[in-house]
Amino acid sequence: MAQQYQPGQRWISDSEAELGLGTVLAQDGRLLTVLYPATGETRQYALRNAPLTRVRFSPGDVITHFENWKMTVREVDDVDGLLVYHGLNAQNEVVTLPETQLSNFIQFRLATDRLFAGQIDQLSWFSLRYNTLEHTSRQLQSSLWGLGGVRAQPIAHQLHIAREVADRIAPRVLLADEVGLGKTIEAGLVIHRQLLSGRASRVLILVPENLQHQWLVEMRRRFNLQVALFDAERFMESDAGNPFEDTQLALVALEWLVEDEKAQDALFAAGWDLMVVDEAHHLVWHEDKASREYSLVEQLAEVIAGVLLLTATPEQLGQDSHFARLRLLDPNRFHDLKAFRAESENYRPVAQAVQELLDKGKLSAEAQETIHGFLGAEGDSLLAAVNTGDDEAKARLIRELLDRHGTGRVLFRNTRAAVQGFPERKLHQYPLPCPVEYLELPVGEHADLYPEVSFQSQPEVSEEERWWRFDPRVDWLIDTLKMLKRVKVLVICAHAETAMDLEDALRVRSGIPATVFHEGMNILERDRAAAYFADEEFGAQVLICSEIGSEGRNFQFSHHLVLFDLPSHPDLLEQRIGRLDRIGQKHTIELHVPFLETSPQARLFQWYHEALNAFLNTCPTGNALQHQFGPRLLPLLESGDDDEWQSLIDEARTERERLESELHTGRDRLLELNSGGAGEGEALVEAILEQDDQFSLPIYMETLFDAFGIDSEDHSENALILKPSEKMLDASFPLGDDEGVTITYDRNQALSREDMQFITWEHPMVQGGMDLVRSGSMGNTAVALIKNKALKPGTVLLELIYVSEVVAPRSLQLGRYLPPAALRCLLDANGNDLSSRVSFNTLNDQLESVPRASANKFIQAQRDQLTPRINAGEEKITPRHAERVAEAQRRLAADTEEELARLTALQAVNPTVRDSELVALRSQREQGLAMLEKAALRLEAIRVLVAG
């Protein structure tokens, strides 16, 4: 018979007990809407199978009104489907309490109900529940939460930025690292940590259309974030009233969005906590006019609290364009371009003084005068201490200057010069004769840069005449691969057709094991290709990628890169080299560039090498130089006088050297120091690597797999294959694939094998499995025989596991101060608590299972004796709970007071501190303290131990 639901009825979620007491809001057709006031969250369920249990108290139960007074139930009436409780309050007065007025924080003693109902679980499940609670508590308190689970090597500056930004309330910042330093990973870490902490629950990611796939791959593969990619087709085909409301994470191409007003309306109506905009430097703004893209992002930034802009470095952009990004973040602060220019000039001497302090360890009289002018009299004592060689004072002085830096809190910009760990590059050039078949082709756009595409598109080309049978680059590639033997080689070319043809050529002409990677393949096909390439023993020697197909992938286990052709823009060239040239690459990057002599390919090679120096170094000036010289460059690539060509090369080289000199002298060491974290990032790296070396996760997961009926078998070194067994307990276990998955706990293995799941405490499989344990009832009762000579046979010990927790909105992050913790009580026959003398594991080693029928018979016989002892357990544990709550309140108050004091003082000298930040922080403190006041104890599990 179907459940009858009425608005106002109280129900509890079977799968999300932590939400507290729910209230039925509405029954609409086949949907049921339930509000959970304790957390402020709403859930919708299918009416026929809602995972809900009716809250119905019985005479003798003590219940709580939402105003915190208690009553003992004597009678229960059902009035039109709503329960009304009658009973006595603490003053012995007759009172009535309708269920609509029940406290949202009431806890349920389900363990007791199951124990006396004969639902007794295995000892292994009891241990799993206890260990799950312990690990949950530990992770929620960890400073690494949201930072350690990414499929990437931990890198100091990225971790520093992620923690600094993600721990703010509604962060509004500009990430402007140089190319290759991992802005996308920084943004992903911020998104991930904000989602896990509850500071954000809905995220909008706006990117150029050509980067959509890269973001999709990065978010899914690195962070296990299920991002929904939106385009015109998906938007039109959606049955939902507002397609954007159906997803937590939306990835949208700006080019499509700016053209579709209906999609814009839906996007604004959906509501978002955080907006991330990639390639924000392409948003065009001038004082008198802004582009449609800029205006759209500006309107969104006005209604979305958190904004992350990913952009080129300020030096590349120029000051006006840099100002345009900053005004998106804070239009009140950055409203006047002239004032911004003047302010920037004022900071330059301070940055130079800091550079002097860092380089020389002391300050000249001129530098001291500059700092005095900036900090005033309060900086004099610090300066005096610095002059005596006090390193701590030096660090404090730099910190003070950082805090007051004009854009120090909103701008993060790391440079390769400031970040160590990049490999060298070595260039190998191979001029080859241009075949007559290409010389006879008609001249067309890009025809001479990619002649194989033009040749193959001719209708009369037969199988025997295919381009790879005569192109000398193919012969050269085969010879090079044979010379390198089984060394892994990445080949990148502009077009998918070229990549597929090259795979055919290698198979037909050489038998060299190769695989291909292009935009026509789905993610699973690309994963398989990447895994085949990564396999050291039986894998492909060469992976052939198209330009677009390789976006978002990391192949740094290889260090040989073949540029089979050259892209038409220096940014694309840097993207190609960046597939291997990343922090953590352990070898020199060997760049192999074949090109056809006396062709546009040869001149483009010369342009990149001699004018831009783009092969041997990153080229931060490449975009500006291409824009400046592009109108002259393109005609000269195809034809033109040699002297005119050489003149262009010389001019561009001179201009590049001038721009690079400007960049170097304009380096803001103060900003670099702030962005790098001044040592904080290194500490995070060490902590993550230390966590990686621990065995607690694999040990815990093995017990979890056993409990849920997941079979695991060795795949290879450091890798396991997981498959559902015939005895799989719960089909909702988040295995990821019904057929099975391959996992690894090893970070390095996961980096080279993207087809394997990288299992960390943050992985959805781990979190989902732990949620199933916590939200279910399995393991909250057990009966065991204890073998201990010190105990008289027949002695009954009672082990009670309580959860000390606070039910509150995740955005308050009270889990940092009062994470759900298992408080254990071990009562002997006299009511003494032995838990401090006998640990959980020590006790576990002395226990033997009891058949369920025998256990149930014993419990029923002992029910009258056990009930008062169970009730007495809460009295034993309450002081420990109260101590935890008081400490949590103290820490929360201290942390917020310290941060409020810092920000208030800072606001007086640095206008980038927003009033809204201070208001939100005060509100968060008051709400947090009020919620902690309501923290409760919940009896989570009972184990009855009989000495034998």
Swiss-Prot record:
It holds the Pfam family Tudor_1_RapA. It is an enzyme of class 3 (hydrolase). ATP binds at D177, E178, V179, G180, L181, G182, K183, T184. Keywords: Activator, ATP-binding, DNA-binding, Helicase, Hydrolase, Nucleotide-binding, Transcription, Transcription regulation. Residues 164-332 form the Helicase ATP-binding domain. CDD domains: DEXDc_RapA, SF2_C_SNF. Signal peptide: none annotated. Its EC number is 3.6.4.-. A motif (DEAH box) lies at residues 278-281. One of its GO terms (molecular function) is DNA binding. One of its GO terms (biological process) is regulation of DNA-templated transcription. Transcription regulator that activates transcription by stimulating RNA polymerase (RNAP) recycling in case of stress conditions such as supercoiled DNA or high salt concentrations. Probably acts by releasing the RNAP, when it is trapped or immobilized on tightly supercoiled DNA. Does not activate transcription on linear DNA. Probably not involved in DNA repair. Belongs to the SNF2/RAD54 helicase family. RapA subfamily. Interacts with the RNAP. Has a higher affinity for the core RNAP than for the holoenzyme. Its ATPase activity is stimulated by binding to RNAP. This is RNA polymerase-associated protein RapA. The lineage of its organism: Bacteria, Pseudomonadati, Pseudomonadota, Gammaproteobacteria, Pseudomonadales. The gene is rapA.
